[in-house]
Design a protein with these regions (language model features):
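Active-site region of chymotrypsin-like
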Residues: 43, 135-145, 174-227, 232-235, ...
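Conserved active-site neighborhood of the chymotrypsin/trypsin-like protease fold
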Residues: 49, 74-77, 86-174, 197, ...
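C-terminal, low-ordered peptide segments at domain boundaries
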Residues: 140-150, 313-314, 320, 341-422, ...
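PDZ/PDZ-like domain segments forming the peptide/carboxylate-binding groove
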Residues: 201-211, 261-311, 400-475
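C-terminal subregion of chymotrypsin/trypsin-like serine protease catalytic domains
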Residues: 214-254, 500-531
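Gly/Ser-enriched beta-turn/beta-hairpin loop segments
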Residues: 55-59, 122-127, 182-197, 248-251, ...
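N-terminal activation segment of mature serine protease catalytic domains
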Residues: 28-87, 91-92, 103-104, 128, ...
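PDZ domains, with a preference for the canonical peptide-binding region formed by the helix
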Residues: 98, 235-236, 304-343, 468-497
Length: 531
């Protein structure tokens, strides 16, 4: 005879039901696709960048497709009225990579097949964000701005289930699900910016500018997706960008002012009088912008930022995301303009410095990082093409430029400070951190020599770093034209940094003007200078 143990049977059925219902309990509600289908704004950009090897020409046009999100600028009583943006009107938000160097931006609504032309209102290339406007009022009919919500970390209920859109065809859309891997600090190499970024798995068919959804709320914007993973900008950064866009004078996002490392060896700790067992990070370079640029020195040992102690690997305990790199403080806890205390060891003494949270700036470097929306700067004299060393120029060596570009040029970028050319140049560079970008010294090159009878014998010269012209030190491109106005003899003399193919060259003063005109006509160069 079979005997039933009713408590056991009841317990068993309870466990089975719980097991069957568990996926439904844990899985977040899938967002409805219809509202997004009606509100969707598709973006197509036609982009044509400059050819930095032949700076008066442009490269072939390429196209990209993605999305743009309808937004309204947040209203703040403390912000001044902006000249370029209006808080009461709607704008489109997308990535800067989608619109950089665009000759045409074509925007389409799913319910209106007619394309509209968009224009860039504001672009922050370092943060990879851009704001667009469309003048035709018909485009904005029935469109509503997105209501943003902060993204939740994985430990919170249903927080791991996130969604974005997948466009299979013009009429066939679906929602694609994924999971938050972590909130990381990403390095945007083209601008050397360290910013918060969400790393996702499972989402691979979305694109730039697509919304990121969690618990049926919009919590971010997709940066890139593919091969089963994606990256997204969280809401907090997007709202900060929009808030800055609505201010009287735009500032980029909050950023640190230094590069850092662990103490490389015990002798370094001894030299800088740092207790090696004390948690913290070693400041090995101070940038001319960002939080702490006014108070920090190279060699400082930073132990605490505000109320957050630093570990040896530069991590803090974030209240939402746990152990993270300290840059994550700028996501939601530290905003531009906030007062901030920095605790550190300097020359063996523990000190506290007061500063304010400051924003990223683009041009505070000897070698400017990638620039978009601006034509290359150049000067042509006697066929010698003078340009400033930039990341755009180095990128002309292709995707592997970090190993293919000339080593002596790459060193300037990797250190982002000049090789010691002479004592006078060193002094100028040391002062540049506290000066505006117009006075910052640059590395000026003769990138190539355009053939003409005046420069026979010099035509193989390339990538030569200019020290002086006619005895005048060259620290920026505009110095070149000024120096050519003041020859010391009947010849112009150009001196180069040792290591170039030549240490110096000469060009006759007589005939230089005629040579410039021949070169302009023969090579169809629109103008001989651009800066």
């Amino acid at each position: 005879m079979i005997k039933f143990n009713f408590p056991s049977v009841i317990l068993g059925w309870t466990l089975i039901c719980a097991f069957l219902l568990l996926p439904q309990v844990l899985k977040a509600e899938v967002p409805a696709i219809k509202p997004w289908f009606k509100q969707a704004v598709l973006l197509k950009s036609y982009q044509q960048s400059y050819d930095w090897l032949t700076p008066w020409e442009k490269r072939e046009i390429r196209t990209q497709t993605g999305m743009a999100l309808v937004v309204r600028l947040p209203v703040s009583e403390n912000t001044e009225s902006a000249e370029t943006v209006d808080k009461q009107v709607l704008y489109l938000l997308t990535t800067a990579e989608m619109v950089a160097d665009a000759t045409l931006l074509e925007v389409t609504r799913k319910d209106i097949r007619q394309p509209f032309q968009a224009k860039i209102v504001l672009m922050d290339y370092a943060a990879n964000l851009a704001l667009l406007n469309i003048e035709d009022s018909n485009f904005w009919d029935s469109l509503n701005p997105i209501d943003w919500s902060p993204v939740k970390s994985k430990p919170k209920a249903d927080a791991g289930n996130i969604y974005s859109l997948n466009i299979k065809s013009v009429q066939e859309w679906e929602v694609q699900s994924g999971t938050i891997q972590l909130m990381a600090v990403g390095h945007r190499r083209v601008s050397d910016a360290w910013l918060a970024v969400l790393k996702l798995s499972g989402i691979s068919k979305s694109g730039q500018g697509f919304p990121l959804l969690q618990d049926n709320e919009t919590v971010g914007m997709i940066l890139e997706a593919g091969k089963g993973e994606a990256k997204a900008i969280p809401t907090q950064m997007l709202l900060e960008f929009l808030a800055h866009a609505g201010s009287g004078s735009y500032k980029s996002l909050a950023h640190r002012c230094f590069s850092w490392s662990r103490l490389p060896q015990r002798s370094t700790a001894d030299f800088f009088q740092i207790p090696p067992e004390l948690p913290g990070i070693w400041v090995n370079r101070v940038l001319p912008y960002g939080t702490g640029s006014d108070v920090l020195h190279r060699g400082d040992y930073l132990t605490k930022i505000g109320e957050w102690p630093l570990s040896h690997d530069g991590k803090i305990k974030h209240p939402e995301w746990g152990r993270s790199l300290f840059d994550l403080l700028f996501l939601d806890l530290l905003k531009v303009g906030d007062s901030l205390d920095l605790e550190l060891i300097r020359e063996g003494k523990a000190i506290v410095l007061q500063t304010r949270v400051s924003a990223y700036e683009e041009d505070g470097r000897t070698v400017p990082l990638k620039r978009v929306g601006h034509p290359p700067r150049y000067v042509i004299q006697g066929g010698f093409l003078f340009q400033e060393l930039t990341l755009n120029y180095l990128s002309m060596w292709g995707a592997n430029w970090r190993s293919r570009a000339p080593v002596r040029l790459r060193l300037f970028l990797e250190q982002n400070k000049t090789v010691l050319m002479d004592d006078n140049y060193k002094n100028v560079q040391g002062e540049s951190a506290s000066q505006n970008t117009e006075s910052a010294p640059r590395v000026v090159l003769v990138t190539q020599v355009i053939p003409d009878e005046i420069n026979i014998g010099y035509q193989k010269l390339s990538n030569a770093i200019v020290l002086r012209i006619n005895g005048q030190r060259i620290r920026r491109l505009k110095d070149v034209d000024e120096a050519f106005l003041n020859p010391e003899t009947e010849f112009h003399r150009i001196d180069f940094l040792p290591g170039s193919d030549r240490l110096s060259v000469i060009l006759p003063v007589a005939g230089l003007k005629q040579s410039n005109q021949r070169i302009k006509n023969n090579f169809r160069i629109p103008k001989l200078q651009s800066y």
